[in-house]
Every structure is written in C-alpha cells, then in structure tokens.
Amino acid sequence: MPSPAVDLLKQKTASLPNAPISVVAANTFVPPTQPVTAGNQLPTSVPLPVLPAVEAAKRLAAYAAVDRHIAHEHKVIGIGSGSTVPYVVDRILAQGFEANKDRVFLPTGFQSKELIVKAGLTLGDVDQYARIDVTIDGADEVDNELNSIKGGGACQLREKVLAEAADTWIIVADYRKNSEVLGTSWTKGIPIEVVPFAYAKVLTNLAHMGSPHVLPNGQPGLSLRMGKMKAGPVVSDNGNFIIDAPFAEELMRQPEELLHKIKMLTGVVEVGLFCGMAKAAYFGNEDGSVTIRSDDGTISQL
C-alpha cells in the first residue's frame, strides 16, 4: 500500500505542467510541447500565474537552473533558503512523480525543510548524506567572480555545509542581486554567525578590522541583528547570534581574504561570504531573459 508521503507527492506532481518555460517573456502562455529535463534550452512556455516583475524574474532564474542542472540521475539534492527557492521546489515537482520518488532532499534551514515536507518530497539531512549531487540556493548578492553574500535569513552555516558537500552548487536570484562588487546592493553587511557569549568580543574585533558602527549615509552599520517580531537578538537554527558587519569597498573587493580574517576570530561560527564555490549563477531579468554567470568566466543569456 502506498505511504501517505507517496500519495502526497503524486498529488503534488499530477497537476503540474511538465514543460520548460520560455525566457522570452516571464508570463507568456504557450501550450507545453516538451518534458522538463536537465539541459533543455527552454524553447517553449507553459501557463504560469502572472507575477510582479521581481517575482517573475526569480521564477525564471529558478526554473532555468533546475532545467539545466537537476537531471534524472541526481538522487541527493540540496534545497537552499531565500525567496527564490520556492520556485526551485515548484520546478522540481514539475519533473514528475517518477523523477522524484527515489530522490532525497536536504534543507539548509527551517524554510526549506517546510517547502520539502509540504511538497511531499523525501526529507533527509546532511549528516546522513555527506555527498550531494546538486544544491541550488539563493543569495543576497553575487559579484562578477561568483563570490556571494548569504545569511540574510540567518542560515549561512547550514547553507555553506550543503554548498561544500555538493558536486555542483548553483545560485539563483533576480537581477537586483547581480553586482560587480559585493556590498553594492546588499548594504546591510556580511552576516556572521557567532556563539552568544562571544558576540560582544567579536563586535569589538570587527570594529578594529574596519567595520563602522555608522555608515557614511547615517544608517546603522556594525551591529548585532535584532528580531523584528520579538524582543532580543535573532537566533539562528543552531542557537547562535548573527552580527551584520559592513566593510568599505576596497576590503569587499578581496572577499576571500576578508573571509579568512573574520573566520579566525574566536567565537565566530561561520561567515556569510561564499568564495570560489559556485558553478554558475542564474539571474532572472525584468525583460524575461536569464543571465548566466559561469565559473569559467563566461556570461550567457537565455
């Protein structure tokens, strides 16, 4: 007898369109003619809900990344965090029940765990699977060398573990996250996860490294991240605090060097700088196209 999880997965996949989307227009309606498989060039489109420009761009990036990087033989898949990731799960579901019934999906945090469970996909964890076929994740900002800032959702530790464990790590984002230098559009600073009893010491260390308490525009700079719907600091899924540390452009142009310096501070658990890890980054654009930056330095357009 099929398990409730199998029944849920069949239900979730049965009504989904099984065809690649068009990247000519984000909300175009054209009947599907081709199954979703990795490597498709996205020549056709399917009926999709009309979304605001930014959301449509996120969906385009996510769908293109799944179509090109999640193949039938991939059985262990990492699911990242952020506002683009729900579209990643949608596109994986569109590959159908047969493609997904033998797969296991590893989350980077509570949000992605909930997405996996609600989709009826099989949930696993990285402590069970030290090697992952593909991880697809969002980013707060990506530079032209595929270095990225992550941790706006306080998940950077698990995100980095799943990124390092993956044979292929792919970033998906909208056009606003595509920058020449980190810190250009994401001005809140580098998210740094610290053990709670060390946060004051780490704040002092970061200030000595050049992270200002007040930005030139008068906005708050270096600070312990505070909760918006609760009194007190944000607490990560691992029970730690998050510090946001902005740095000047000249330091952000050398993100790997900055990463190593911050990581050496006692009390720091993980740093939201991801350097030299991504195979490619997919950016959905306002005009319905997708820009792909690859780790070999090439830039292509869909």
From Swiss-Prot:
E.C. no: 5.3.1.6
A GO MF term: ribose-5-phosphate isomerase activity
Main subcellular localisation: cytoplasm
Catalysed reactions, as listed in the record: aldehydo-D-ribose 5-phosphate = D-ribulose 5-phosphate
GO BP terms: D-ribose metabolic process; pentose-phosphate shunt, non-oxidative branch
Cellular compartments annotated: Cytoplasm
Keyword flag Transmembrane: no
UniProt keyword annotations, A-Z: Cytoplasm, Isomerase
Transport found in the keyword field: no
This protein's pathway: Carbohydrate degradation; pentose phosphate pathway; D-ribose 5-phosphate from D-ribulose 5-phosphate (non-oxidative stage): step 1/1
Highest taxon of source: Eukaryota
Cellular component, GO annotation: cytoplasm
Family designation: Belongs to the ribose 5-phosphate isomerase family.
Annotated protein name in UniProt: Ribose-5-phosphate isomerase
Organism: Cryptococcus neoformans var. neoformans serotype D (strain JEC21 / ATCC MYA-565) (Filobasidiella neoformans)
Record gene name: RKI1
